[in-house]
Curated annotation (Swiss-Prot):
GO molecular function ontology, one term from the record: large ribosomal subunit rRNA binding
Superkingdom assignment: Bacteria
Similarity comment text for this entry: Belongs to the universal ribosomal protein uL10 family.
Pfam name, any one: Ribosomal_L10
GO cellular component: ribonucleoprotein complex; ribosome
Keyword check for Flavoprotein: no
Official protein name in the record: Large ribosomal subunit protein uL10
Gene Ontology terms describing biological process: translation
Length: 166
């Protein structure tokens, strides 16, 4: 018979494993010496974009990652680590932790998983500086409308010139 504590740990590992497997974005970060008030501020920022930040015991995180396609992350789970898990958002949690880490030097991005691919801290930093989807669409629409505006302006000038010549 399995002890209740062990059963609870097994349940937690399988729950975390499932969350990691289904997530669009998972970020592992170190937060030693971060005041609780700052950690709660990060938690509130992430909650606004439907993401969660969780602290699990190291062995539970290691076992959960071992049972996924991300076994390479197990060796990085030394020290005090936390996870950001996002089921919907892809870049927003990356931007939040990137900006938070810039403000709080004790927070260090260790690694992550973005769209089922393990990414390094450098790749996470690169992704954080990308414009959002809305900004990209706005830039695309401006780029597509610019030639039309120029054509309309040229046609207007041409019609005004012809009107003054007649």
């Amino acid at each position: 018979m399995i002890k209740p504590q062990l059963a609870k740990k097994i349940e937690t590992v399988s729950f975390l494993q499932e969350k990691i497997s289904q997530a669009k974005t998972v970020i592992v970060f170190e937060y030693s010496n971060l005041p609780v008030s700052e950690f709660m501020k990060l938690r509130r920022q992430l909650k606004k974009i439907d993401c969660e930040v969780k602290v699990y015991p190291k062995n539970i995180m290691q076992r959960a990652f071992m049972n996924t396609n991300y076994q390479d992350l197990v060796s990085l789970l030394k020290g005090i680590k936390a996870l950001i898990i996002s089921q919907q958002e892809l870049l927003e949690p990356i931007k939040v932790i990137y900006n938070f880490a810039k403000q709080n030097k004790v927070v260090k991005i260790v690694s992550g998983v973005v769209e089922q691919k393990i990414v390094s801290p450098q790749e996470i930093n690169s992704l954080a500086t990308l414009p959002s989807k809305e900004q990209m669409l706005a830039l695309l629409s401006v780029a597509m409308l610019s030639p039309l505006r120029q054509l309309a302006f040229a046609l207007k000038l041409l019609s005004e010139k012809q009107a003054t010549n007649n």
